[in-house]
């Protein structure tokens, strides 16, 4: 059950939870389309603690809470908070949980979201912890695939770019291992999927490639990620891999008729702007899906 529970990893959610979230997201999307007023979170407060830059995720969560009739208190810049004075994450968490009903946290250190959960008296949602996981982005990704194809099973899904540091990739692969799918991992050798993630992927067919051309004609889903410059400790390594892959409008001509291109955003040069108006481009729809999906998750955690 989701009620009053935290979501730190995608593995904190059962298959039944996923289906419930997607069905609830459909209802939320319908309400948004019809302009229906939702007040189920009236009187509830969400605290957003973002120790790392964010545009889509933070605004998506805050918009979702407000559209449910709730309110938001926000720390969008750790430099202006007491953490800049040396306050520990544990103490910050204790204080913020006394001000709110639910906490959404993003932090540059892997494992930080679990620490927040440990010291919080309220449910916690992980909005990204370093190169660890980003479970709500995975919910949005799965929902987008499901809405595009009607099902997630029996698809060939190619994940392209920074597989080493990309937390969206790690969460997505853990979730996809529950389905009957074929996975292609396309990356430079420097950015291959870490062994600790690969070892957790059971009963799933995975192929690894360096060349995008190996998968361009056969894939149903292209999940493209930016190279995470901020995670590199050696700038020379970053310079070796920047610009390795870039999908252009010409590439879409080689794809299946109904293939979709996704990206968790922000993008740099991984997808040309010429792709934006093609029928394959789904990344802006994917971003928009974040609102009903996060509305669904919040309402299921805090609902009566």
Swiss-Prot record:
Pathway: Pyrimidine metabolism; UMP biosynthesis via de novo pathway; (S)-dihydroorotate from bicarbonate: step 2/3
Catalytic activity line of the entry: carbamoyl phosphate + L-aspartate = N-carbamoyl-L-aspartate + phosphate + H(+)
Binding site for carbamoyl phosphate: 56-57, 106, 134, 137, 265-266
Residues bound to L-aspartate: 85, 167, 226
PROSITE patterns, per database record: CARBAMOYLTRANSFERASE (PS00097)
Domain of life: Archaea
Leader sequence segment: none
UniProt keyword terms in alphabetical order: Pyrimidine biosynthesis, Transferase
Molecular-function annotations in GO: amino acid binding; aspartate carbamoyltransferase activity
GO biological process: 'de novo' pyrimidine nucleobase biosynthetic process; 'de novo' UMP biosynthetic process; amino acid metabolic process
Keyword Isomerase belongs to the record: no
Broad enzyme group: transferase
InterPro entries according to UniProt: Asp/Orn_carbamoyltranf_P-bd, Asp/Orn_carbamoylTrfase, Asp/Orn_carbamoylTrfase_sf, Asp_carbamoyltransf, Asp_carbamoyltransf_Asp/Orn-bd
Keyword Manganese assigned: no
Assembly description: Heterooligomer of catalytic and regulatory chains.
Similarity comment: family membership: Belongs to the aspartate/ornithine carbamoyltransferase superfamily. ATCase family.
Role noted for this protein: Catalyzes the condensation of carbamoyl phosphate and aspartate to form carbamoyl aspartate and inorganic phosphate, the committed step in the de novo pyrimidine nucleotide biosynthesis pathway.
Protein name: Aspartate carbamoyltransferase catalytic subunit
Species of origin: Picrophilus torridus (strain ATCC 700027 / DSM 9790 / JCM 10055 / NBRC 100828 / KAW 2/3)
Gene: pyrB
């Amino acid at each position: 059950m989701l009620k009053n529970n935290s979501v730190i990893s995608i593995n904190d959610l059962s298959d039944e939870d996923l289906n419930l979230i997607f069905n609830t997201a459909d209802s939320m999307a319908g309400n948004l389309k019809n302009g229906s007023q939702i007040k189920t979170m009236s009187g509830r407060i969400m605290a957003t603690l973002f120790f790392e830059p964010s545009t889509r995720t933070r605004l998506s969560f805050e918009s979702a809470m407000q559209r449910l009739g709730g309110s938001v208190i926000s720390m969008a810049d750790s430099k202006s908070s007491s953490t800049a004075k040396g306050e520990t994450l544990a103490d910050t968490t204790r204080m913020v949980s006394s001000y709110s009903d639910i906490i959404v946290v993003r932090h540059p250190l892997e494992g930080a979201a679990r620490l927040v959960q440990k010291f919080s008296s309220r449910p916690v949602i992980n909005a990204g912890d370093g190169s660890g996981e980003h479970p709500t982005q995975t919910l949005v990704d799965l929902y987008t695939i499901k809405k595009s194809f009607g099902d997630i099973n029996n698809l060939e899904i190619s994940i392209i770019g920074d597989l080493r540091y990309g937390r969206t990739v790690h969460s997505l692969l853990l979730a996809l291992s529950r389905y009957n799918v074929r996975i292609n991992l396309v990356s430079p050798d420097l950015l291959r999927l870490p062994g600790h993630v690969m070892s957790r992927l059971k009963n799933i067919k995975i192929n690894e490639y360096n060349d995008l051309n190996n998968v361009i004609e056969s894939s149903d889903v292209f999940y493209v990620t930016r190279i995470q410059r901020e995670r590199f400790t050696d700038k020379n390594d970053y310079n070796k891999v920047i610009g390795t892959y870039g999908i252009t409008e010409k590439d879409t001509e080689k794809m299946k008729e109904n293939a979709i291109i996704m990206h968790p955003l922000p993008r740099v040069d991984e997808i040309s702007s010429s792709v934006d108006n093609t029928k394959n481009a789904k990344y802006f729809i994917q971003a928009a899906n974040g609102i009903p999906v996060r509305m669904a998750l919040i309402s299921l955690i805090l609902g009566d």
